[in-house]
């Protein structure tokens, strides 16, 4: 189980990403579309002044059950370990053990 502080940090990042998503996309689009060097530089400065944690790259998907940050399946929001446990119990329909 992940520490509560890590889970809270990730939820805070998720909120910041959503809050600044539109503003960040507008600035990036302005940088790409503009030919004026001064406008590009001003837009880059505004983009740099946004909170660091509002960058979507810093957001990490975590397992909803245990909080593990690696090997999380987006479809289920579960890590590989919890997904396997849920499949074995039968809580996720359609899953079965593979054999070859």
From Swiss-Prot:
Molecular-function GO term, any one: metal ion binding
An annotated GO BP: translation
Entry's Gene Ontology cellular component terms: cytoplasm; small ribosomal subunit
Co-factor binding details: Binds 1 zinc ion per subunit.
Cofactor section: Zn(2+)
Alphabetized UniProt keyword annotations: Metal-binding, Ribonucleoprotein, Ribosomal protein, RNA-binding, rRNA-binding, Zinc
Amino-acid positions noted as binding Zn(2+) in the UniProt annotation, renumbered to this chain: 63, 66, 79, 82
Family annotation (HAMAP family): Ribosomal_uS14_1 (MF_00537)
Family, per entry: Belongs to the universal ribosomal protein uS14 family.
Subunit structure: Part of the 30S ribosomal subunit. Contacts proteins S3 and S10.
Role this protein plays: Binds 16S rRNA, required for the assembly of 30S particles and may also be responsible for determining the conformation of the 16S rRNA at the A site.
Descriptive protein name: Small ribosomal subunit protein uS14
Gene symbol of the encoding locus: rpsN
